[in-house]
Curated annotation (Swiss-Prot):
InterPro entries: Ribosomal_uL14, Ribosomal_uL14_bac-type, Ribosomal_uL14_sf. Belongs to the universal ribosomal protein uL14 family. GO terms for molecular function: large ribosomal subunit rRNA binding; structural constituent of ribosome. The keyword Ribonucleoprotein applies. HAMAP family: Ribosomal_uL14 (MF_01367). It comes from Neorickettsia sennetsu (strain ATCC VR-367 / Miyayama) (Ehrlichia sennetsu). Keywords: Ribonucleoprotein, Ribosomal protein, RNA-binding, rRNA-binding. This is Large ribosomal subunit protein uL14. The gene is rplN. One of its GO terms (biological process) is translation. Binds to 23S rRNA. Forms part of two intersubunit bridges in the 70S ribosome. NCBIfam families: rplN_bact. Part of the 50S ribosomal subunit. Forms a cluster with proteins L3 and L19. In the 70S ribosome, L14 and L19 interact and together make contacts with the 16S rRNA in bridges B5 and B8. Transmembrane segments: none annotated.
Length: 119
């Protein structure tokens, strides 16, 4: 469950390392896997596609704690940065993702680029 002001890791090679959630799409209070949120880049590498302080959209690919008591639990909260057309800014995805991205949310490209997909 991701709320506003949550610091998240970035799971792609766009250049950002840490982002801050500043908005959740829709009228929801929390975001889960597959939801699109608005983030601000807080920490990044010097040579990258994004810069610190820039605002982007992102899709949640891993969460530490789920609202339902399911078996798959990840070790961190992570997102993949998107542009305005909901396409990935980076070209690679690091770490595991959940199969909910492919099945329910329509982000099949992220699932296919990830290192491991959990059911």
């Amino acid at each position: 469950m991701i709320k506003k002001e949550t610091v998240l890791d970035v799971a792609d090679n766009s250049g950002a390392r840490k982002v801050l959630c500043i908005g959740i799409s829709g009228s929801k209070k929390t975001a889960s896997i597959g939801d699109v949120i608005t983030v601000s880049v807080k920490k990044c590498i010097p040579v990258g596609k994004v810069s610190a302080g820039s605002i982007h959209r992102a899709v949640v690919v891993r969460v530490k704690k789920r609202s339902s008591s399911s078996i798959v639990v990840f070790g961190d909260n992570a997102v993949v940065l998107l542009n305005k057309q909901n396409e990935m800014i980076g070209t690679r995805v690091f770490g595991p993702t959940d199969s909910l991205l492919r099945r329910n949310k329509g982000f099949a490209k992220i699932s296919s680029l990830s290192q491991e997909v959990f059911q």
